[in-house]
């Protein structure tokens, strides 16, 4: 395995709430993230979902929807100067979301959906493909190649450098470990960095899917531990969901970090990356 990469000079940081709750809530989080966004060592993206289409229960809050959600993300982009990440679940959403978002994310459950990957790849946005909890990390090269060949039909095999050049990233978010639990195999980070830049999702990796009577639970106290380990193994950036009041968040509150907790985590991550 190769251990050195021609990687970007800055570490990527993708941070924000799980789902858009309101414009006021987005602003309250965006303000708290300004110190991180202004850190010269970070390439910062503000994230939030306009629709959580894969919630466990029909009764769970999903978000404001495509049109209203993108309007609010555009306001955050203009007011704070932040670059934006949001996820898309259906092919028709890609071209519309790309008018606002700098990164379009493919959810983990949809990481093999060819039509969705192709449609997102036809936009100018960076693509962040989350590794499915059920996926062999080696097999994520085929999802990467779908995106790369859509953007450049001459590409025959995925490499880290080619994926970096064409804006195709992968995101590790844990693997299924029996029912209702996830575990992170740190080997996945090195395996996937053979053919794409890799972002580590620290907060979804501590999720316990379906563990709370119709919704997911988790333990955010483990997120900093896993993130520090991932930084030591070697990653291109960190994904972490954050909220000013995680206990009352409308989605994934058990996994999210408060902004000050995230800031301490990122400080640790950068120190670890300095060692390599």
Curated annotation (Swiss-Prot):
* Reactions performed catalytically: D-arabinose 5-phosphate + phosphoenolpyruvate + H2O = 3-deoxy-alpha-D-manno-2-octulosonate-8-phosphate + phosphate
Chief site of localization: cytoplasm
Assigned EC number: 2.5.1.55
Places the protein is found = Cytoplasm
GO terms (molecular function) for this protein are: 3-deoxy-8-phosphooctulonate synthase activity
Extract the InterPro entries matched here: Aldolase_TIM, DAHP1/KDSA, KDO8P_synthase
Q: What family does this belong to?
A: Belongs to the KdsA family.
**Listed name of the protein:** 2-dehydro-3-deoxyphosphooctonate aldolase
Q: Which organism is it from?
A: Helicobacter pylori (strain HPAG1)
Taxonomic classification, please?
Bacteria, Pseudomonadati, Campylobacterota, Epsilonproteobacteria, Campylobacterales
